[in-house]
Amino acid sequence: MKKKTFLCLILTAAIFLSAFSTFRNEQGMDGANVVSSVTPEDTADCGAIWANKFSTKGFSCNSIPIMGANGIYIVNSNTLYELSYANGQVLRKTTLKEKMDSVCNMLLEEHFLYIPLANGTMECVDINSMTSLWQSESFGGQSLSTTFYHNGYLYAGTTNVLSNGTTTGLFYCLNAKDGSTVWTYEDKDHPGGYYWSGAIVYEDALYFTGDNGILVSHSLTESVVYDTAVLTTANIRAGLTYHKETDALYTVAKDGTLFQIQCGNQKITKVSSGKIMNGANFVTCTSTPTIYNNRLYVGCMADQYGYVCIMDALTLKPIYQVKGFQNAEVKSSPLVSTRGSSTGEVTVYFSMNALPGGLYAFKDTEGNLL
């Protein structure tokens, strides 16, 4: 049986100006997942420009797309494709040493594409020549976390899903030049994998969290833990992001608790929290927040409906929610576009984890309460 997996280009070419080099273009600075490109404003401006399909045996998924100078890079199964911006045709391709898991959060730094793959491995491909330069050792498990790059080092985590639904895993650091292991971290007393979560650098420490709900402050280049903090007993399957005005990190637990985390001198100094949906009987959230103009946007499912929640990033209190469809969780990290405007109005884009699939948008402005 062959499964055909499709990649559709939905937005106009203007969104390519964003040129994201990794998931959310997260680089540990203010404004992650916020763009100024003149993106489409309404349904009439949207639609598929082209679609491509990859024919594979059995089940396969597409990685996140990476925008390069010469094309779009995407992995399906164990093949890396370079696609034309104009029509989606395959320009070049190369076979990887492992297949990707259900998620593959690649990262492009200069002309080096770092690709997390099955069995807890990372492979580096030079996209100028489309040749593999190195493959890391195997850490085991699935590569489901985001990938973070900082000053010549790569950071990512692994996940092993056990029969009872719990997870184990480790976090690791690689030398980006040759793929050699610099350090690994595993909390065997409080096991938990790194399932869609990831790391961020603040000042001179690496911060990451995962399914055990524990935030870790770790040395960038040595096997040294500076500090830990138990944020929650729930899983954390969202990434961390930074907000300049509060000088704080933010993440969300699976139970819908939003955390604001202040750090200094490699220590976790203060943790504040708030609920993204008050009054709901059941909430699940794996969406990484996006922050703009002190408003925080995060997706979830609450009482069987998908939502995007708009929160006050200063007080951690809900402002309002945008309701989606039944049984259609908003797992995506909302993309906020200013469209080059200085009025404060933004367009917020998101997708829902349900068929038939698609892209949705709404407008928001400072002071908007509904």
Which residues fall in each region the model found?
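Hydrophobic core
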Residues: 11, 15-18
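Extracytoplasmic/lumenal domain signature
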Residues: 22-62, 66-103, 107-144, 148-370
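Positively charged n-region of N-terminal signal peptides that target proteins for export
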Residues: 1-5
